[in-house]
Swiss-Prot record:
One CC-aspect GO term: plasma membrane
EC number: 7.6.2.-
Superkingdom, natural source: Bacteria
Alphabetized InterPro entries for the sequence: AAA+_ATPase (IPR003593), ABC3_permease_C (IPR003838), ABC_transporter-like_ATP-bd (IPR003439), ABC_transporter-like_CS (IPR017871), MacB-like_ATP-bd (IPR017911), MacB_PCD (IPR025857), Macrolide_Exporter_MacB (IPR050250), P-loop_NTPase (IPR027417)
Protein name: Macrolide export ATP-binding/permease protein MacB
Organism this protein belongs to: Shigella sonnei (strain Ss046)
Length: 648
């Protein structure tokens, strides 16, 4: 009869300083299907090392070990994991159940790594627990079960994928005599069902119940009676068959890894929350700075637009501060008419200004009087709270009419509800009020200077007595390049004057400078916020590294029941990403609260969240999880299952 497990001259040595300590010294052993074998020996005799090699948790230094004719030395790590998953079931002295999983969930773990569908897993786990008398304990956690019940859960887990070979390491060592007898009775039943049962023990009474007792001493077999030949041995029971297609198996495996990661995080809620805190603050900082910074930029640009955007001012002289008399009369009314005819001009308004006294009844105030055209208010985006602007008839007739700003209205008419039609003195000229320009709220503040506007023909002809203009403001049509328009304007006036006795001031350049400045400032603040996100990511990495250390035994258990290194890597990586994703979602929520609070205190700000900003925040948190979760996950995947199981 061909042995199920065949060992020939197995040796296992470990480094100890500069030397090699040989634990197993030429072990040769055959174990047949359906046998119940006990391996006995004193502590340090090498029986646990032999069990680890039998269960494919460890590899021999030399020699040959075959499982059902397959030489395990030719198998890589994933193939060994598959061999453990499909052929072996482990029963440990300390049960080695995962504390954050219920009895039913613990039993399901081997089938998760076998790729069995959830419904099939659940039915099989319930069936096994019922067979072992735990049908009313399926939802209990290990801490709620007695030692005997925990060991029965461990046995059910060993049988989940079929458990052709049951490896029991001191299965009764931590139990009272009654529970120990129950466990041994179950092992006898498994033997009767066709399982191969290998018990590692130092208890003579337990060993006596086996069909064959193999004694090991100082790494050598000193007693090995011949096997009892069995007829019609099934060689195990109900092996689990996975019929799920490759793609569905991948999706199912990912979902299970996600579920296991969530359970692991939920088992340590406070630590998980504290780990998330750095990500929450980082994401909230990034999103808030981007969103609030954008709102502030729009507010600044709106204030600049209120001054007049897409406009070009033309002044006499060579530059600001040039008071050369030969240039002061450079701009004429004919220049204004020529400019208004250009195809790229939306509107053009002249300006003639002088500081004058305004009087109404017994109120006498100083103000800046500006002679403009009716287009002036359109050029600067100003609206009216009362009345309207000048019409062409008033401009042509040098009408004695005036438009007030809201500050002037309050000074001259503090108690009047409607001031249109009232007459005031502008200098020594009576003028009828035809409108009140609405005050624009600006983050730069309001001007302290009182301002009034008259038709430029009235201002120059009736008030100042001059035939030239102090300046011309041109509004460029939408769609035309402001810089190109400025060049054409300069060319036009230079041809008309025969020389360049004027200079221009393009507000579009100011706008672009402000936009560049705000972008730079926003980038700087975003980088500061990103640093806080990186700090949060490092916090995640530190906690995950600690988690790997704390959960080393759990990793060993998962590997013992068939988890591949990639399964462990995936689970810990998903845990890190999950922490960062949930932290990112909470960070976005926090940034929404910050924005809502700012909106209450700054009603003029338009704070909005674009879908792109939210998507980038989620991508950022996911990338943080992958980046800073990789090292801990890799460390977890590289753990040796024997070393991992040995740690507490």
């Amino acid at each position: 009869m061909t042995p199920l497990l065949e060992l020939k001259d197995i040796r296992r040595s470990y480094p100890a300083g500069n030397e090699q300590v040989e634990v197993l010294k030429g072990i040769s052993l055959d174990i047949y299907a359906g046998e119940m074998v006990a391996i006995v020996g004193a502590s340090g005799s090498g029986k646990s090392t032999l069990m680890n090699i039998l269960g494919c948790l460890d590899k021999a230094t030399s020699g040959t070990y075959r499982v059902a004719g397959q030489d395990v030395a030719t198998l890589d790590a994933d193939a060994l994991a598959q061999l453990r998953r499909e052929h072996f079931g482990f029963i440990f002295q300390r049960y080695h159940l995962l504390s954050h999983l219920t009895a039913e969930q613990n039993v399901e773990v081997p089938a998760v790594y076998a790729g069995l569908e959830r419904k099939q897993r659940l039915l099989r786990a319930q069936e096994l627990l019922q067979r072992l008398g735990l049908e009313d304990r399926t939802e209990y956690y290990p801490a709620q079960l007695s030692g005997g019940q925990q060991q029965r859960v461990s046995i059910a887990r060993a049988l989940m994928n079929g458990g052709q070979v049951i490896l029991a390491d001191e299965p009764t060592g931590a139990l009272d005599s009654h529970s120990g007898e129950e466990v041994m009775a179950i092992l006898h039943q498994l033997r009767d069902r066709g399982h191969t049962v290998i018990i590692v023990t130092h208890d003579p009474q337990v060993a006596a119940q086996a069909e064959r007792v193999i004694e090991i001493r100082d790494g050598e077999i000193v007693r090995n009676p011949p096997a009892i030949e069995k007829v019609n041995v099934a060689g195990g029971t109900e092996p689990v068959v996975n019929t799920v297609s490759g793609w569905r198996q991948f999706v199912s495996g990912f979902n299970e890894a996600l579920t296991m990661a969530w359970r692991a995080l939920a088992a340590n809620k406070m630590r998980t929350l504290l780990t998330m805190l750095g990500i929450i603050i980082g994401i909230a900082s990034v999103v808030s700075i981007v969103v609030v910074g954008d709102a502030a930029k729009q507010m600044v640009l709106a204030d600049i637009r209120s001054i007049g955007t897409n406009t070009i001012d033309v002044y006499p002289g060579k530059d600001f501060g040039d008071d050369d008399p030969q240039y002061q009369q450079a701009l004429k009314y004919d220049d204004l008419i020529a400019i208004q005819k250009q195809p790229w001009v939306a509107s053009a308004t002249p300006a003639v200004s002088q500081n004058l006294r305004l009087r109404y009844n017994n109120v006498d105030v100083a103000a800046s009087a500006n002679g403009v055209s009716g287009d002036y208010f359109n050029v600067y985006g100003m609206t009216f709270s009362e009345g309207n602007t000048f019409n062409q008839e008033q401009l042509n007739g040098r009408a004695q009419v005036v438009v007030l700003d809201s500050n002037t209205r309050r000074q001259l008419f503090p108690h009047k509800a409607d001031v249109v039609g009232e007459v005031i003195l502008v200098g020594n000229m009576p003028a009828r009020v035809i409108g009140v320009a609405e005050e624009k709220q600006s983050m730069f503040g309001s001007s302290k200077v009182l301002r009034v506007w008259l038709p430029y023909s009235t201002m120059s002809g009736r008030v100042m007595g001059q035939s030239w203009l102090n300046s011309i403001t041109v509004r460029v049509k939408e769609g035309f390049d402001s810089a190109e328009a400025e060049q054409q304007l300069t060319r036009l006036l230079s041809l008309r004057h025969g020389k360049k006795d004027f200079f221009t001031w393009n507000m579009d350049g100011v706008l672009k400078t402000v936009e560049k400045t705000t972008r730079t400032l926003q980038l700087f603040l975003t980088l500061v916020a990103v640093i806080s996100l990186v700090v949060g990511g490092i916090g995640v990495m530190n906690i995950m590294l600690v988690s790997v250390t704390e959960r080393t035994r759990e990793i060993g258990i998962r590997m013992a029941v068939g988890a591949r290194a990639s399964d462990v890597l995936q689970q810990f990586l998903i845990e890190a990403v999950l922490v960062c994703l949930v932290g990112g979602a909470l960070g976005i929520t926090l940034s929404l609260l910050i924005a809502f609070t700012l909106q209450l205190f700054l009603p003029g700000w338009e704070i909005g969240f674009s879908p792109l900003a939210l998507l980038l925040a989620f991508l950022c948190s996911t990338a943080t999880g992958i980046l800073f979760g990789w090292l801990p996950a890799r460390n977890a995947a590289r753990l040796d299952p024997v070393d991992a199981l040995a740690r507490e």
